[in-house]
Amino acid sequence: MQNIGFAAGSLIKGRWTVVKKIGQGAFGEIFSGKNIINNEQIAIKVEKVDTKKQVLRLEVAVLKKLQLCPYVCRFITCGRHNDYNYMVMELLGENLSELRRKQLDGKFSLGSTLKLGVQMIQSLQAVHDLGYLHRDVKPSNFAIGLNPSKRNITYLIDFGLARRFVLASGEVRPARESTGFRGTARYASINSHLSKDLGRRDDLWSIFYVLIEFAEGQLPWRKLKDKDQIGEMKQKYNTPDLVKDLPPQFSQFMKHLKSLNYEDRPNYVFLQTLLNDCYTSLGLSESTPFDWEVQTNSGASSSSSNTTQQQQQQQQQQQQRNLNQSGLNNSSARLMASPSTIDVEASGKSTQLNNSNNNNNNNNKGLGAENDSSPQPQIIRRNSESNSQIANSSESDNKGSGGGSWNQKSSSPRHKDKNLQDDGGEGSQKHLKASNNNNINNNNNNYNNNNNNNNNSHMNGNGSNSQPIDKIELSHQQQKSSTTKCCSTSKCSVM
């Protein structure tokens, strides 16, 4: 695409200043920036208003609904500036693709791979429970926090290819006979290569491929460029041999995914428990750092640093080999994936999501998994997913392109949503406390009940407002009144 041309030093709405371009995609560009009022570092995503395929509106809609999930980046504001639509969000650190390439042999230790897997599954479950598919799951669409206290948190980003997979009634949309390819060839599911309509299982197939690459440093089709050839090789390796050098939990993970049909809801708890059991069987604990968190003396040489990391990886690899030889017993021990506190900031303010890990009666003892000492995969096959379990709002058909202009003259209900208007950066984040005292199922029920009573306020709007997107501010009372939860994890409960 052509360079959008946001110059360094440009000022947006008298508050956000552009620093430099940090990324570019098919439909827009991303810049780092700064809030000139409080010096907060931000990211600004922009697209031209006359872009044929506008995706920013959809991304804003999804991101705003996920703001209570600890594994989704913080949304700040959105609007129009001159001939551009823009979205301001929290600036994050390196993505997982960059971090992996910095590791020895280009791979993560097994322990880090498993911890990452649990966080990624939890973030995808939150998206799915809102009724959306991500459809472009890959390492570069997960990034760690920029703040040192958040470098152990993985955030899901880039919802430009997201698609709503449920109807207003809560039923899963009928599968289309044929669709175009969606995603990134290396990590896309076989169904995507076959031009089949994608479901929740396909996002998890992408997670599966990502985890293999994290643990082994490569995928068998890494050298191929043609997506059709990649698809053929994926079908060839669609057997347990693909994970023969990994712990047996990976083959169980694969077996569950292969059992799912288009409309089925994956057993997220079962998948998290598999990874959690493998993690605890390695003798690792909650305090075990990610590979990139390993501390080295500032004066130590590069070779000394490499030796330390190499010893750590060799130790974990030896543990892995021992486990492969002897097999693993299911463990009831669980490890909490999130840190004890997670900062959530909004417009220069901050609060704490208190995730207490010391409650002996807490049913969520795993990396987000339920306390089930002998988990069995459960598959729900039905076209109706119950209105209380999937998203709440009535949606027009979304083809994955984000469709439509931010101009309020559009006839699509989605384009008249008052919640997508520019709020000037104030009050876009709800200050709520997360409780860790409810198990995952209770959280699902509470979240869904809230959704059903929310009158579809997040996405539908009343369609009566014809003002431009950057002229309408959300009142504090409007924002304060919404307590819809974004996901079913214990960390996202609303007190």
UniProtKB/Swiss-Prot annotation:
Compositionally biased region (Low complexity): 295-333, 354-364, 435-466
Positions of the catalytic residues: D136
InterPro entries named among the record's database cross-references: CK1_Ser-Thr_kinase, Kinase-like_dom_sf, Prot_kinase_dom, Protein_kinase_ATP_BS, TTBK_Asator-like_STKc
GO cellular component, one term: nucleus
Domain of life: Eukaryota
Keywords, in A-Z order: ATP-binding, Kinase, Nucleotide-binding, Serine/threonine-protein kinase, Transferase
Annotated Polar residues bias: 385-395
Keyword ATP-binding: yes
Entry's Gene Ontology molecular function annotations: ATP binding; protein serine/threonine kinase activity
Protein kinase domain segment(s): 16-275
Positions with a binding annotation for ATP: I22, G23, Q24, G25, A26, F27, G28, E29, I30, K45
Region (Disordered): 293-469
An individual GO BP term: protein phosphorylation
Family under the similarity heading: Belongs to the protein kinase superfamily. CK1 Ser/Thr protein kinase family.
Protein name: Probable serine/threonine-protein kinase DDB_G0292354
Top-level taxonomy: Eukaryota, Amoebozoa, Evosea, Eumycetozoa, Dictyostelia
